[in-house]
From Swiss-Prot:
Compartments where found: Plastid, Chloroplast thylakoid membrane
Organism domain of life: Eukaryota
NCBIfam families named among the record's database cross-references: psbC
Residues that, per the record, bind [CaMn4O5] cluster: E367
Protein name (database record): Photosystem II CP43 reaction center protein
One GO process term, biological-process aspect: photosynthetic electron transport in photosystem II
Keywords associated with the record: Acetylation, Chlorophyll, Chloroplast, Chromophore, Manganese, Membrane, Metal-binding, Phosphoprotein, Photosynthesis, Photosystem II, Plastid, Thylakoid, Transmembrane, Transmembrane helix
Its biological purpose: One of the components of the core complex of photosystem II (PSII). It binds chlorophyll and helps catalyze the primary light-induced photochemical processes of PSII. PSII is a light-driven water:plastoquinone oxidoreductase, using light energy to abstract electrons from H(2)O, generating O(2) and a proton gradient subsequently used for ATP formation.
Lipid bilayer topology: Multi-pass membrane protein
A GO term, aspect molecular function: electron transporter, transferring electrons within the cyclic electron transport pathway of photosynthesis activity
Record PTM Phosphothreonine, positions in chain: T15
Chief localization: plastid
Subunit-structure text: PSII is composed of 1 copy each of membrane proteins PsbA, PsbB, PsbC, PsbD, PsbE, PsbF, PsbH, PsbI, PsbJ, PsbK, PsbL, PsbM, PsbT, PsbX, PsbY, PsbZ, Psb30/Ycf12, at least 3 peripheral proteins of the oxygen-evolving complex and a large number of cofactors. It forms dimeric complexes.
């Protein structure tokens, strides 16, 4: 099977004490990789590599199920999810399971079911992983040619790509079906403070859906992260699912064009680098989404966004001082600008003070108070509802600014509580993991290109001093 590279060039690493851990066909002598290089030993053993991937999927699903049940066991219905350090239950609640008006949890049984289903699935995957790693055929090409492959077989690789794209498309449509037919999803914009509803009037207009991609990523534009209604989100999944499925069929039925055969590197390590690059992009986009977007990630479950907590503070003190007799329309702040209200660069009436930088914020508790020219003074004087006051006071004291030792909230906010927002956790983890994946992409892309060009950078291993020394064992 070693048809692509000379072992000496492609597997330059020599390590000691390898003999004791040798497995037939998976030791350093036969693969060029030591035990610690993990799946690199299985580059040409498709059956064993299948086992490694299935077992890895089992570990992922086991974590999901176990963590899900852990969160259910610790969940206190009287407290908001974001005060309890939960990262999985908010996702289930966003999908409309177990919640009612205002995001209140009315039934935790669906969460329990989700955890148990994932645990059962992980057992099946774990068994399959162990079977293929230890008992199944080492290579699939002979017994199961459909599942076999050679890394440089361009046609087979694009067929595998097509199958993956179809699976991703089906995944996108699962969300669409949940929103349309299976109980709906949670809409933070539903009147009166959010509720679960079926999405009936999908946005399928390509100018709207693809218009998001053409927006600037900065300021009030916010690229795709600026999406703020569920019709657009679910409609976008219809488009995405359709494109993935059609693209998958295309890649299964066609062979790569000549320009693609020339431009791309066709090796296992190259495919690894492409995948890491794609995952890195996903990580960075997810980071921005969970940090800024309060429609796909409702604040009832994930806590307020940073801009939302800041605007909530301005709103809370406007309400308080207005009750104490302040004229919020004309009061002047220490800088000579409006203390409570001022104008944005484009003329809208916005909150004054430090929160002016977040004037683009849109949030369901605030939008009813806006008119055609920004915040409406008469509505601020007459129309503020108790639920809006309660929600903004809650969000003011739960800003997503927290350190790892759980001293959460704004440093100067005397009413803040000790907590770290799930938005902080999810945004930080996805940024850091996205960055690591990007470094891995650069590393493996460089190695794959070097191998394809016929050279490897590094020490000349043929004359390394350590080779003449006594083995450690």
């Amino acid at each position: 099977m070693k048809t692509l590279y000379s072992l000496r060039r492609f597997y330059p690493v020599e390590t000691l004490f390898n003999g004791t851990l040798a497995l037939a066909g998976r030791d350093q002598e036969t693969t060029g990789f030591a035990w610690w290089a993990g799946n690199a030993r299985l580059i040409n053993l498709s059956g064993k590599l299948l086992g490694a991937h299935v077992a890895h999927a089992g570990l992922i699903v086991f974590w999901a199920g176990g963590m899900n049940l852990f969160e259910v066991a610790h969940f206190v219905p009287e407290k908001p999810m974001y005060e309890q350090g939960l990262i999985l239950l908010p996702h289930l609640a966003t999908l409309g399971w177990g919640v009612g008006p205002g995001g209140e949890v009315i039934d935790t049984f669906p969460y329990f079911v989700s955890g148990v289903l994932h645990l059962i699935s992980s057992a099946v995957l774990g068994f399959g992983g162990i079977y293929h790693a230890l008992l199944g055929p080492e290579t699939l090409e002979e017994s199961f040619p459909f599942f076999g492959y050679v890394w440089k077989d361009r046609n087979k690789m694009t067929t595998i790509l097509g199958i993956h794209l179809i699976l991703l498309g089906i995944g996108a449509f699962l969300l669409v079906f949940k929103a349309l037919y299976f109980g709906g999803v949670y809409d933070t914009w539903a009147p009166g403070g959010g509720d679960v509803r079926k999405i009936t009037n999908l946005t399928l207009s390509p100018s709207i859906i693809f218009g998001y991609l053409l927006k600037s990523p900065f300021g009030g534009e916010g690229w795709i992260v600026s999406v703020d209604d569920l019709e657009d989100i679910i409609g976008g999944h219809v488009w995405l699912g359709s494109i993935c499925i059609l693209g998958g069929i295309w890649h299964i039925l066609t062979k790569p064009f000549a320009w693609a055969r020339r431009a791309l590197v066709w090796s296992g390590e190259a495919y690894l680098s492409y995948s890491l690059g794609a995952l890195s992009v996903f990580g960075f986009i997810a980071c921005c989404f969970v940090w800024f977007n309060n429609t796909a990630y409702p604040s009832e479950f994930y806590g307020p966004t940073g801009p939302e907590a800041s605007q909530a503070q301005a709103f809370t003190f406007l309400v308080r001082d207005q009750r104490l007799g302040a004229n919020v329309g004309s009061a002047q702040g220490p800088t000579g600008l409006g203390k409570y209200l001022m104008r944005s660069p484009t003329g809208e009436v916005i909150f004054g003070g430090e929160t002016m930088r977040f004037w683009d914020l849109r949030a369901p508790w605030l939008e009813p108070l806006r008119g055609p020219n920004g915040l409406d003074l008469s509505r601020l004087k007459k129309d503020i509802q108790p639920w809006q006051e309660r929600r903004s006071a809650e969000y003011m004291t739960h800003a997503p600014l927290g350190s790892l030792n759980s001293v959460g909230g704004v440093a100067t906010e005397i009413n803040a509580v000790n907590y770290v927002s799930p938005r902080s956790w999810l945004a930080t983890s996805h940024f850091v993991l996205g960055f690591f994946l990007f470094v891995g992409h650069l590393w493996h892309a460089g190695r794959a290109r070097a191998a394809a060009a016929g050279f490897e950078k590094g020490i000349d291993r043929d004359f390394e001093p350590v080779l003449s020394m006594t083995p450690l064992n």
